[in-house]
Regions:
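Beta-lactam-recognizing serine transpeptidase/beta-lactamase-like catalytic domain environment
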Residues: 1-168
Length: 168
């Protein structure tokens, strides 16, 4: 439960759980720098509540991709790579010999039961394949050659002091 007397520790615990999936954490991508997203230091109890379902902290597209991949990998969070390896040039300037292969690096395993991970994965699947009005991803399944899943979301922007929400 939420410790109302110590909201800071409650938010910290929530964010630690999110970080297990790569949200608000470095992804481990093979670039010299990366953003960890935006996690405000000051917040209210209302912010804590909305953060619990994804409406307060802001994450990078790469963090969101890593989050989805972590769920797909049954909780195994893997560092993303931009390249498979580093190659030399051949005498004609083309692709030469492999100099360094980029190995898969597992960053962590999410602390979640197999049963609960299965529920999350089923929820992602139902976003595309469900039969209710909440099946917001149905159109992306048209013509699929492999089973796909998706995560719903709401992108919020603030322009000229007018808040806009875009549900996806």
């Amino acid at each position: 439960g939420v410790d109302l007397k110590n909201l800071d520790s409650s938010m910290e615990k929530l964010r630690e759980t999110f970080a297990e999936y790569g949200l608000g954490a470095k992804t481990g991508v093979d670039l010299p720098t990366e953003s960890q997203g935006y996690t405000p230091k000051e917040f209210t109890f209302a912010n804590y509540l909305t953060n619990a379902f994804g409406q307060f902290d802001n994450y990078t597209p790469l963090q969101l991709a890593q989050y989805a991949a972590t769920v797909a990998n049954n909780g195994k969070r893997v560092a993303p790579h931009l390249v498979e390896g580093i190659y030399a040039n051949d005498k004609n300037g083309g692709l030469g010999d492999l100099i360094e292969k980029k190995e898969t690096k597992v960053l962590n395993q999410v602390n979640i039961s197999e049963e609960n991970m299965k529920l999350i994965k089923e929820g992602f699947y139902q976003v595309v394949h469900g039969g209710s009005g909440f099946t917001t991803g149905r159109t992306i399944s048209q013509g699929e050659s492999v089973p796909i899943s998706a995560k719903t979301g709401t992108a919020e922007t603030l322009t000229k002091k007018i808040q806009q929400a875009n549900n996806t």
